[in-house]
């Protein structure tokens, strides 16, 4: 299938926060409760529709273990978007966000779009990080923020789509050099897409997602 652009994503965060599950839910629409630890990187891809254009998302799921951080760093280069994930039931994964963010910004393009994700929102009774804390961290560091559940699929689609919308907005503003693939964007074989039907229904804009739009 032809596409207007290809956007490269990287998923980062501590081990066990649900990075692989978020990828699987988005690409295959299924949840795998028992998942082997990612060794190095895993890969997934899916087409989405942004403003009537077909966009191919190429997603790299990275290992969270410290021993693989050097491998992970090499994938920051050439990524247009990053999903920075923590587990709302494990405070330490939230505390480590600053380290992950420093790594991402040191080794990536300054225009890379970063979506902060508080995953496992289905485990509300075990919550250890308040939603307001995630929102505050995102505001402080200029990130987009959502809480998701890879198990129920709540907000998973929106997280990927809204990241792509922000990347596309930056392209429209001329902030990304789309002719330089080091920025994580590749012009597709057919940039004019005549089909108006995509695999995803229209999603809310980031600005439309208020503090009350949590998972059901």
Swiss-Prot record:
Q: What does UniProt list under activity regulation?
A: Regulated by guanine nucleotide exchange factors (GEFs) which promote the exchange of bound GDP for free GTP, GTPase activating proteins (GAPs) which increase the GTP hydrolysis activity, and GDP dissociation inhibitors (GDIs) which inhibit the dissociation of the nucleotide from the GTPase.
Locations of Polar residues compositional bias? 189-207
**InterPro entries the record matches:** P-loop_NTPase, Rab_GTPases_membrane_traffic, Small_GTP-bd, Small_GTPase
Q: Where in the cell is it found?
A: Cell membrane; Endoplasmic reticulum membrane; Golgi apparatus membrane; Cytoplasmic vesicle, Secretory vesicle, Acrosome
UniProt topology in membrane = Lipid-anchor
| Keyword Hydrolase listed | yes
Q: Which residues bind Mg(2+)?
A: 20, 38, 61
Binding positions for GTP per the UniProt entry: 16-21, 38, 64, 119-120, 122, 150-151
Q: Name one GO cellular component term.
A: acrosomal vesicle
State the top-level EC class: hydrolase
One Gene Ontology term of the molecular function aspect: GTP binding
Q: Give GO BP annotations, semicolon-separated.
A: defense response to virus; Golgi organization; innate immune response; macroautophagy; positive regulation of exocytosis; positive regulation of type I interferon production; protein transport; vesicle-mediated transport
Tell me its EC number(s), please: 3.6.5.2
Catalytic reactions on record: GTP + H2O = GDP + phosphate + H(+)
**Lipid (S-geranylgeranyl cysteine) attached at which positions?**
215-216
Q: What is its main location?
A: membrane
Top-rank taxon of the source lineage equals Eukaryota
Q: What does this protein need as cofactor?
A: Mg(2+)
* Ranges spanned by the short sequence motif Switch 1, renumbered to the chain: 37-42
Motif (Switch 2) positions are: 63-72
Record's keyword terms, sorted: Cell membrane, Cytoplasmic vesicle, Endoplasmic reticulum, ER-Golgi transport, Golgi apparatus, GTP-binding, Hydrolase, Lipoprotein, Magnesium, Membrane, Metal-binding, Nucleotide-binding, Prenylation, Protein transport, Transport
Which stretches of sequence are listed as region Disordered? 189-216
- Self-association and partners: Interacts (in GTP-bound form) with GARIN4 (via N-terminus). Interacts (in GTP-bound form) with GARIN5A. Interacts (in GTP-bound form) with GARIN1B. Interacts with VPS39 and VPS41.
Q: What does this protein do?
A: The small GTPases Rab are key regulators of intracellular membrane trafficking, from the formation of transport vesicles to their fusion with membranes. Rabs cycle between active GTP-bound and inactive GDP-bound states. In their active state, drive transport of vesicular carriers from donor organelles to acceptor organelles to regulate the membrane traffic that maintains organelle identity and morphology. Regulates the compacted morphology of the Golgi. Promotes cytosolic DNA-induced innate immune responses.
PANTHER family, alphabetically?
DRAB11-RELATED (PTHR47979)
| Name assigned to this protein | Ras-related protein Rab-2B
- What would be the name of the gene that encodes this protein? Rab2b
């Amino acid at each position: 299938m032809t596409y207007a652009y290809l956007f490269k994503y990287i998923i980062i965060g501590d081990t066990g926060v649900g990075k692989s599950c978020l990828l699987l839910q988005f690409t295959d629409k299924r949840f795998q409760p028992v998942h082997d630890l990612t060794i190095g990187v895993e890969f997934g891809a899916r087409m989405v529709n942004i403003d009537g254009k077909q966009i191919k998302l190429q997603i790299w799921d990275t290992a969270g273990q410290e021993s693989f951080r050097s491998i992970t760093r090499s994938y920051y280069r050439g990524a247009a978007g990053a999903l920075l994930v923590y587990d709302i039931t494990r405070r330490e994964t939230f505390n480590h966000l600053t380290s992950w963010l420093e790594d991402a910004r040191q080794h990536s393009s300054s225009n890379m779009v970063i979506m902060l994700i508080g995953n496992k929102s289905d485990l509300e009774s075990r919550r250890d990080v308040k939603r307001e804390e995630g929102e505050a961290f995102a505001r402080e560091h200029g990130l987009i923020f959502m809480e998701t559940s890879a198990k129920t699929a709540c907000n998973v689609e929106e997280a990927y789509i809204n990241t792509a919308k922000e990347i596309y907005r930056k392209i429209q503003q001329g902030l990304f050099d789309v002719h330089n693939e080091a920025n994580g964007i590749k012009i597709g074989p057919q940039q004019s897409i005549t089909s108006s039907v995509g695999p995803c229904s229209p999603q809310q804009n980031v600005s439309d997602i208020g503090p009350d739009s949590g998972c059901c």
